[in-house]
Amino acid sequence: MKMPERFEFPEGATPIDDCSGLIPVWVHHLHDLNRVEAENILNAQRKYLQGRVGDPQTWFQVKELKVIHQAMFGNVWEWAGVYRKSITSIGINPSLIPTQLAELCLEVSSWSEYPVELTFVEMAARVHHRLVFIHPFENGNGRFSRLIADRFLLAFRCQHPLWPSQLNQEGVVRKDYIKTLKSADKSDYTPLVDFMKKLGATDPSLSELIKSSFYRTHISGEKGLAIVKALLRSGSSPNDQTSNGHRALQLSVKAGFEEIVKLLVTFDADVDTKDKSGLTPFQIAVMQENKVVADFFLSKGAKQQPPPGIGYEKYYKLYRE
């Protein structure tokens, strides 16, 4: 059966010049191609974006990324999950794809082990852009990159963007999106991060990050300090509190995150405000019998007020003996 010679694609998309890999023989028009691809992608989204998503270290690997692309387009294109061999207007030289993709996987894996001053949304934006920049496959790289960025955010229990269908069509939305990617080409990720946030991408709040046992392994030591710095830099309040009134500062004292405590105070967290516990940060430090942190609060102007009840005995032990 005669195959279509060429489809028309929106600005910034990689045109498909060779349709010989098209599997559904009845597809001759772009709207038919869009439909069968959308059905295939929806099935992949159900598989990879629903349910629990593991730490990126367990799945952000070259082999798995190729499997995901194959799952997205394997019912439509024979080249799904196979590295691009052609020179395209977007993307690196095909000979560099294996090395560049492997390096990206190593970098993403390192984010789970070493401190990097990026929020989770900022990390996802870099993942998205780098995959688009590498352009590993013959086509579908934008949609693939967005799904991977979404999966990355879900791994950290963050809300991913609700990407509009207009991204696949000529128009203002797509033009704005392409502009953010071009800014990222110049190492300016702010427009892409803002674009993703506008579409619903969110980081955990500071209080949620510190309180939730899920994030405990992510905020220990220097790694946690870097993430908190990134959240504060991106506009999170040092006086943030949970929906039921537990403040990030008090939660940090309770959890023993001394460096995060100091960082929050450096960013002007209030040292005398009581939270849901009914205690000030100084009083919680006393209850923890942590004189180092208690003295730190005093050095920052906190009121030296003993905790009520049995807390007075601990205060007496620390400051009266």
Identify the function of each model-found stretch.
Residues 227, 259-260, 292-293:
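Conserved ankyrin/ankyrin-like repeat signature
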Residues 1-215, 226-230, 277:
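FIC/Doc superfamily catalytic core
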Residues 242, 275, 308-309:
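Ankyrin repeat boundary/linker residues
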Residues 229-237, 262-270, 296-303:
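Ankyrin repeat domain, specifically the short helix-to-loop turn at the C-terminus of the second helix
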Residues 218-220, 253, 286:
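Specific position within ankyrin or ankyrin-like helical repeats
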